[in-house]
């Protein structure tokens, strides 16, 4: 009887732990960025209009010193931290990934290259933080092959 009671309590506690951490991660949209993005006194920069299909790659928090960069561009040939998860967006660029609590770097993949243009004050690339029980909202971008970005 005691064994049955302990087994029931153990199962209940595991279920509660699983449920509490089950709906956390990141969600967002990937946009294609092109055209005049420079601010001016009488003009707002053009905003991305529609999301695009893309591959999203989540890595352990990655510093600029842990990647092989392509020149001075925000493209990277290889990333020397562990990949946590990879997923494709839908046709409108939307994605949602469940992740454990922690800090990560988010990249979009373009061919064999990874793209991330944002850095924090410690030179970590495209940092995101997943908090317990929360979905972190993310906006990602990819550069267009056909439109200049300035």
Question: Can you say where each PLM-predicted feature lies in the sequence?
Answer:
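Sec-dependent signal peptide recognition
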Residues: 1-7
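Primarily secretory-pathway and cell-envelope proteins
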Residues: 14-71, 110-150
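Short, acidic Ser/Thr/Gly-rich low-complexity loop/linker segments typical of extracellular
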Residues: 66-92
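Beta-strand-rich interaction surfaces with strong enrichment in secreted/lumenal proteins
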Residues: 84-87, 95, 125-129
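Short, surface-exposed beta-strand/beta-hairpin micro-motifs centered on an aromatic residue
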Residues: 91-99
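A short tyrosine-centered beta-strand micro-motif
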Residues: 100-108
